[in-house]
Amino acid sequence: MGEMNGEGQIEVLENDIRTLRKQLQEKVQQLKTLKKHFQKNCITKLNNDEIARYSRQIILSEIGVQGQLKLKKASVLVVGAGGLGCPAALYLAGAGIGRIGVLDYDEVELTNLHRQLLHTEATVGLTKVTSVQSYLEQLNSQIEIETHHAQLTSENALALLEPYDVVVDATDNVATRYLLNDACVLLRKPLVSGSALQLEGQLTVYNYRGGPCYRCLFPTPPPPESVTNCGDGGVLGAITGVIGALQALETIKIILSNEGVLAGRLLLFDGQQSAFRNLKLRPKKPTCAVCSEAPTLTKLIDYEQFCGMRATDKDAALTLLEPCERISVRDYHDGWLAAGRDHLLVDVRNANQYEMCQLPGAPVNVPIEDILSNRRTEELLARAQQAQLPVYVVCRRGNDSQLAVRHLAPLFRERNLPAPRDLIGGLHAWTKTIDPNFPIY
């Protein structure tokens, strides 16, 4: 009987705790709303909490009270809540930017956590903008954090960017860079652009006080197959931290109208050597399609079509080969691997990635760089000629393998050998279709 009473008491207490937690959340939300209302109606002076919080930067001659008020009145949109966006948003929030918008279409994944440090294991599966908002609101409850869980497109870009003073480009694909550039030029807003790949980073400011825009320097996009993002090429988290923090710094300097803004200059960071370099960029192009006196581009266009690639870094798939030059992972598995038929499988990932995981069947590792530079093509040709076996090529996502097949096919035909074939979708397709326990990265 006593045991039943104990269980009943536990249930009552648990219900009470749930009720109290709900009430607490409601009170916290009321407090946030009240603070935001107070902040919006008190932008001409700093309160005691703000003076204490920002005192270490207010005492700088470059900032002062008036500078802090400028930061309080300012609004910044951070496009991308990843490796660059996280540190940029973090330092902007810490500095007291009054209103910060965070735009991202993605959800938090385990692969993000080594470099996107506003996200945690507890927020895996949540939208990135929700994760960032939660962190920043705990850091600084006196500022306003707006979230936009959406993919930036030609249809929504102008409306999303228009309410903000400065835009931070923390994205990882070419199409979005062109879109952001053109939208910022049309809206007359400065664009703080950063990028990070492997152990290197870059930073500049476009469309600021007569400086060049992105199109002035790059009027036409690069070939899709030549573009590498951090998902394919890799990146060290500390590199994105450095560049993202510097993006916040440039944004703050713009808001304060301070000297030294990186307009017309490109900052290069070499993480391997811990070295910074500043390069002078070409001036604003008089015939630029979007920022010249007589622009030919006066509205946003289809940037995926313009660049020949998707405006996302999520498993962007190239189609470089004819269907007869490719094979699905299912057909390869059932028709060759599981059937035990002799063949040669070539894995074109680099040695580090190859060491992480390999398909069964003892594939030969020949990195794509060694194929495209012909360093090891003779080795492959000799092996194929000696064995007289069909050759299949695999990579991580099915893009580099197509480049390899396109390069190797004419060389194979010259020796009267059947051209190699590409495994569609690469190892990602293998995990999704054949073996869900195969590592994905």
Swiss-Prot record:
The active site lies at C230 (glycyl thioester intermediate), C395 (cysteine persulfide intermediate)
Q: In which pathway does it act?
A: tRNA modification; 5-methoxycarbonylmethyl-2-thiouridine-tRNA biosynthesis; Cofactor biosynthesis; molybdopterin biosynthesis
What is the predominant subcellular site recorded for this chain? cytoplasm
Lineage at the top is: Eukaryota, Metazoa, Ecdysozoa, Arthropoda, Hexapoda
Q: Function, please? A: Plays a central role in 2-thiolation of mcm(5)S(2)U at tRNA wobble positions of cytosolic tRNA(Lys), tRNA(Glu) and tRNA(Gln). Also essential during biosynthesis of the molybdenum cofactor. Acts by mediating the C-terminal thiocarboxylation of sulfur carriers URM1 and MOCS2A. Its N-terminus first activates URM1 and MOCS2A as acyl-adenylates (-COAMP), then the persulfide sulfur on the catalytic cysteine is transferred to URM1 and MOCS2A to form thiocarboxylation (-COSH) of their C-terminus.
Q: Which reaction does it catalyse?
A: [molybdopterin-synthase sulfur-carrier protein]-C-terminal Gly-Gly + ATP + H(+) = [molybdopterin-synthase sulfur-carrier protein]-C-terminal Gly-Gly-AMP + diphosphate; [molybdopterin-synthase sulfur-carrier protein]-C-terminal Gly-Gly-AMP + S-sulfanyl-L-cysteinyl-[cysteine desulfurase] + AH2 = [molybdopterin-synthase sulfur-carrier protein]-C-terminal-Gly-aminoethanethioate + L-cysteinyl-[cysteine desulfurase] + A + AMP + 2 H(+)
Provide the binding site for Zn(2+).
C213, C216, C288, C291
Q: Which cofactor does it need?
A: Zn(2+)
Enzyme Commission number(s) from the entry: 2.7.7.80, 2.8.1.11
The answer to whether keyword Cytoplasm applies is: yes
Q: Which organism is it from?
A: Anopheles gambiae
Q: Where is the Rhodanese domain?
A: 339-439
Provide the binding site for ATP: G83, D104, T111, N112, L113, H114, R115, K128, D172, N173
Q: Which Gene3D superfamilies match?
A: NAD(P)-binding Rossmann-like Domain (3.40.50.720), Rhodanese-like domain (3.40.250.10)
The protein in question is named: Adenylyltransferase and sulfurtransferase MOCS3
Q: Which GO terms describe its biological process?
A: Mo-molybdopterin cofactor biosynthetic process; protein urmylation; tRNA wobble position uridine thiolation
